[in-house]
């Protein structure tokens, strides 16, 4: 039997803030046992991996080598507007994809 992805972990400056953004973006909740040092978002109904956020002292210094690709449930423009209201920022618009950054500058795409 092959391995499966149990969780994805972000190093970050503020685990609660980043977990709050991604929980809202993905329709989930920040786990009640989360702390200022480590926060956790359980995968919502889509069954993907859980997401951990660990506080680290050093800042992000380069482009992510891995990122999320989100599928818009309705139109891309509507989803981008919703994510902007949560604190994300558009960095580039393509024909069928929008590149954004979350509240700590982590890149992700909306399709």
Residue ranges of predicted features:
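Short loop/turn microsegments at loop-to-beta-strand junctions
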Residues: 95-97
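Glyoxalase I/VOC metalloenzyme domain signal
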Residues: 1-34, 42-92, 101-111
